[in-house]
UniProtKB/Swiss-Prot annotation:
Residues 38-106 form the KH type-2 domain. One of its GO terms (molecular function) is structural constituent of ribosome. Part of the 30S ribosomal subunit. Forms a tight complex with proteins S10 and S14. The keyword RNA-binding applies. The keyword GTP-binding does not apply. This is Small ribosomal subunit protein uS3. GO terms for cellular component: cytosolic small ribosomal subunit. Belongs to the universal ribosomal protein uS3 family. GO terms for biological process: translation. It comes from the Bacteria. Keywords: Ribonucleoprotein, Ribosomal protein, RNA-binding, rRNA-binding. Binds the lower part of the 30S subunit head. Binds mRNA in the 70S ribosome, positioning it for translation. NCBIfam families: rpsC_bact. The gene is rpsC.
């Protein structure tokens, strides 16, 4: 099943956390639709800001949004003008108090969403797909990835028949739950049609922390 299921959902509660943290006794559908509108608005507004993940927490009439981005300066703006304008627009969209927290992604080459978007942009610029995937995998491995797998599917290089191709480096153990596998799927809009890009990145194993047991004192002789 590890080969079929989404690796992010497979590891929820093990080494990954939920991106939406709230509970609703009633009006669940309305709250979920509001989440989707928030995510769509942020993805369109910050399309060039290398945004990977948007986490949403709710408490009463307040929404806390954490935006994970590789370009925090672009999101915040000079003197915080951009992020304040974004906060006001989201407050108007939801009719609730919105607080925005910006989280910087230190190593964007280890983030599957950002790696996939980088490959998709190169495909849209008519760069050969093998070259784009090879360069992306090499950068990820140099940044410290234990393994990476990239799948491209569609009319590759403008071929008449659609096909799939994979490029893999290192180890990507999808069945190992303690392995920190990041997964993302991105689409590239080319002149020949849509090309799907799937990225799996193995960032190493996350082992449970062992509690230090109190050391036994040696018993005295006399």
């Amino acid at each position: 099943m590890g080969q079929k299921i989404n690796p992010n959902g497979f590891r929820l509660g093990v080494n990954r956390d939920w991106e939406a943290k709230w509970y609703a006794d009633k009006n669940y559908a309305d709250t979920l639709n509001e989440d989707l509108r928030i995510r769509k608005f942020i993805s369109e507004k910050l399309a060039d800001a290398s945004v990977s993940t948007v986490e949403i927490e709710r408490a009463a009439n307040r929404i806390n949004i954490s935006i994970h981005t590789a370009k925090p300066g672009m999101v915040i703006g000079k003197g915080g003008k951009e992020v304040e304008a974004l906060r006001k627009e989201l407050s108007a969209l939801t009719n609730k108090n919105v607080h925005i927290n910006i989280v910087e992604i230190k190593k964007p080459d280890l983030d599957a969403k950002l790696v996939g978007e980088g490959i998709a942009r190169q495909l849209e610029a008519r760069i050969a797909f093998r070259r784009a995937t090879r360069q992306a995998t090499q950068r990820s491995m140099r940044s410290g990835a234990k393994g990476i797998k990239v799948q491209t599917a569609g009319r590759l290089n403008g071929a008449d028949m659609a096909r799939r191709e994979w490029h893999t480096e290192g180890s990507v153990p999808l069945h190992t739950l303690r392995a920190d596998i990041d997964y993302a799927w991105v689409e590239a809009a080319t002149t020949y049609g849509q090309i799907g890009v799937k990225v799996w990145i193995n960032r190493g194993e996350i082992l449970p922390q062992r509690k230090n047991k109190p050391s036994k004192k040696a018993k005295g002789g006399n």
